[in-house]
UniProtKB/Swiss-Prot annotation:
The gene is atpF. It comes from the Bacteria. It comes from Actinobacillus succinogenes (strain ATCC 55618 / DSM 22257 / CCUG 43843 / 130Z). HAMAP family: ATP_synth_b_bprime (MF_01398). This is ATP synthase subunit b. F(1)F(0) ATP synthase produces ATP from ADP in the presence of a proton or sodium gradient. F-type ATPases consist of two structural domains, F(1) containing the extramembraneous catalytic core and F(0) containing the membrane proton channel, linked together by a central stalk and a peripheral stalk. During catalysis, ATP synthesis in the catalytic domain of F(1) is coupled via a rotary mechanism of the central stalk subunits to proton translocation. The lineage of its organism: Bacteria, Pseudomonadati, Pseudomonadota, Gammaproteobacteria, Pasteurellales.
């Protein structure tokens, strides 16, 4: 019977140990496991939320970059258009100024040509009178000279 009493003693000790473990040891272990599961689940949920937020932020950033690129292209196009307008205005002003300068040049050349032509007429008339005086051998009076010069200038 010794064997049976030992077996019963061991059964009672095991039952007490099991009851003690279930009552005092098992709840803190289960609580720690549940807390760990909860913290892991929360961490996974936070990671998923952060991944979702990162994806949303990335999408928003890409949209903003696209908008900025479009706006930059619009600004560049506007600047190019304005540059072309200014260039056209400057070219038109330059053409107008060029035409005005050429016209002034022609007017100055024409005035100079007329002045030189008039001087040439007077000199030709004076030379003609001088030649005529030498041929005739006498001097025509001053009033007659001026009269003859005026007539020659008018004829030329």
């Amino acid at each position: 019977m010794n064997l049976n009493a030992t077996l019963i003693g061991q059964l009672i000790a095991f039952a007490l140990f099991t009851w003690f473990c279930v009552k005092f040891v098992w709840p803190p272990i289960i609580k720690a496991i549940e807390e760990r599961q909860s913290s892991i689940a929360n961490a996974l949920a936070s990671a998923e939320a952060a991944r979702k937020e990162q994806a949303d932020t990335k999408t928003l950033a890409e949209e903003e970059i696209t908008k900025a690129k479009i706006q930059a292209q619009e600004i560049i196009d506007s600047a190019n258009k304005r540059r072309n307008e200014v260039l056209d205005e400057v070219k038109a002003e330059a053409e107008t100024l060029k035409a005005k300068i050429i016209e002034q040049g022609y007017a100055e050349v024409e005035a100079e040509r007329k002045r030189v032509q008039e001087e040439l007429r007077v000199k030709v008339a004076s030379l003609a009178i001088a030649g005529a005086e030498k041929i005739v051998g006498r001097t025509v009076d001053e009033a007659a000279n001026n009269d003859i010069i005026d007539k020659l200038v008018a004829e030329l």
